[in-house]
A protein has these predicted regions:
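N-terminal glycine-/serine-/threonine-rich beta1-alpha1-beta2 phosphate-ribose binding loop
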Residues: 1-100
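Rossmann-fold NAD(P)-binding glycine/threonine-rich loop
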Residues: 89-100, 109-147
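A short hydrophobic/small-residue beta-strand
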Residues: 104-105, 389
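Rossmann-like NAD(P)H-binding beta-loop-alpha module
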Residues: 124-205, 212
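Substrate-binding/catalytic subdomain of NAD(P)-dependent oxidoreductase enzymes
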Residues: 182-282, 286-289, 308
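Low-complexity, glycine/alanine/valine/leucine- and proline-rich hydrophobic stretches
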Residues: 270-295, 309-310, 383, 388-399
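Glycine-rich phosphate/pyrophosphate-binding beta-alpha loops
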Residues: 298-300, 304-310
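A conserved regulatory-domain signal marking ACT and ACT-like small-molecule sensing domains
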Residues: 320, 324-444
């Protein structure tokens, strides 16, 4: 009887920053992993668009392919790492691999957000495995925490800084008194901004990640039309400074709230004011932080590197280890038919809250013509919508005949604030569109 270790073949599709990081660290740690897992890991090959493109990580030319389906169909490949990005070809490759019963590992949050239901169904139907820890918050094991370590909990709230680019920009603005434009220029130079900048700056990237967390926590796929998605383009250095006057910092957050008594759920991605003494307020730079509030554990906050080659490669390699254990029969299977039925049942217990039902405190900034009676017009509109003001800070701009008002409100509905802002925009005395930010007080 042979005692030869089980051979595990690995194929990587996409050899950009993350793919090269995975190959580099696997090559360095493979022997140690093999001894710990009792297997023989073979790096079968990588698939790229341009084999001749210069790359920092060098691999033998014989291990470079250009046909991803050929790599997936190679009988030696047990685990496919889909690290190419995009949602069209990546979807086709992923489904093809799963239908062959292979394990797929992905860092592709957009793909999961848009096609997760179809991909998860393919897992349950064909017996493959799908792992996606690297899709949310890079080196922070939040997906494994939701699936395993914190599985005993019903989560009333998940609040996270899950886009490192936005956090970097707001941190630089706050710490160095930089304008948004100057901070963004530096972020571009350092390679912190996606090629399609709207993914980071308009909240789309964070929305993709929040949808994944919402499904894992509550069993519900949340469409874009049922969410509040905003970026940070309208946040100014002036707002950063005024936030400190209210005892807060501005952070770009993903917020998932579940009201079990009402059967409602909300998902939002937006810049918000959070108290200076909260844990998330101290998460700066490109780091991520996620606070999860459960009925059993209370509030747990995970902080770490949310992006970058090494942090993401760490998550991918962690998934490779889980895939190997599953192939050996030493780990439980995830996304079985029973799992998906349980998620569907869980999701059916929650409906998305309406704007009238979503309550928040707000920060409101507007500039007024320096003229008698104009403030009264503003506060009349707020009163019409039932908006109670908690605090007001006013300051003048010498020689400009205008003044800026910043105020905080008591809790009021999103719908009421939306109506009030529409009315304020029509006032001739309001010199520029008002800025509205939410004020949160996370349990952390």
């Amino acid at each position: 009887m042979s005692n030869a270790p089980l051979k595990i073949g690995l194929g990587i599709i996409g050899f950009g920053t993350v793919g090269q990081g995975v190959w580099k660290h696997l090559a360095a740690t493979r022997r140690n992993m093999e001894m710990r897992l009792g297997v023989k890991i073979e790096l079968i090959g990588v698939c790229v668009r341009d084999p001749d493109k210069p790359r920092k990580v060098k691999i033998p030319r014989t291990q470079i392919l250009t046909d991803p389906f050929a790599l997936v169909q190679d009988p030696r490949v047990n685990i496919v790492c889909e690290l190419m990005g995009g949602t069209t070809l990546a979807r086709d490759i992923t489904l093809h691999a799963l239908r062959l019963g292979k394990s797929v590992i992905s860092a592709n949050k957009a793909l999961i957000c848009e096609h997760g239901m179809e991909i998860f169904a393919a897992v349950s139907q064909h017996g493959g495995q799908y792992f996606f820890e690297a899709s949310v918050a890079g080196g922070i094991p939040v997906i494994k925490s939701l699936r395993e370590g914190l599985v005993a909990n019903c989560f009333s709230e998940i609040v996270g800084i899950i886009n490192g680019t936005c956090n970097y920009l707001l941190s630089r603005m706050e710490k160095e008194s930089l304008s948004y434009e100057t901070a963004l220029k530096d972020a571009r130079r350092l390679g912190y901004v996606e090629a399609d900048e709207s993914l980071d700056l308009d909240g789309v990237d964070a929305y993709h990640k929040a949808v994944i967390l919402a499904f894992l926590a509550h069993g519900k796929w949340v469409p874009r039309k049922n969410t509040l998605v905003e970026g940070i383009r309208n946040v100014t250095l002036e707002d950063i400074r005024r936030a400190s006057d209210f005892g807060c910092k501005i952070k770009h957050l993903a917020v998932i709230h579940r009201d079990f008594s009402k059967g409602t759920m909300t998902l939002g991605v937006y810049p918000a004011l959070i108290p200076l003494d909260s844990i998330l307020a101290r998460v700066d730079g490109v780091h991520n932080g996620i606070s999860l509030t459960g009925d059993v554990v209370g509030t747990t906050t995970l902080v770490g590197r949310g992006a970058g080659q090494d942090a993401t490669a760490s998550a991918v390699i962690g998934d490779i280890v889980d895939a190997i254990r599953a192939l050996k029969g030493a780990a439980f299977k995830f996304l079985t038919t029973e799992d998906l039925e349980s998620y569907a049942t869980l999701g059916s217990t929650a409906r998305m809250a309406t704007l009238e039902e979503i309550l928040s405190r707000f920060y409101l900034r507007f500039s007024l013509r320096d003229k008698s009676g104009v403030s009264a017009e503003v506060y009349r509109i707020l009163a019409e919508e039932g908006i109670s003001v908690a605090r007001v800070i006013q300051y003048e701009h010498a020689g400009t005949q205008r003044g800026t008002h910043t105020l905080s409100t008591y809790p009021v509905s999103e719908a009421a604030m939306e109506r009030a802002v529409r009315k304020l925009r029509k006032l001739r005395s309001v010199l520029e569109p008002p800025l509205v930010l939410r004020i949160l007080a996370p349990a952390s």
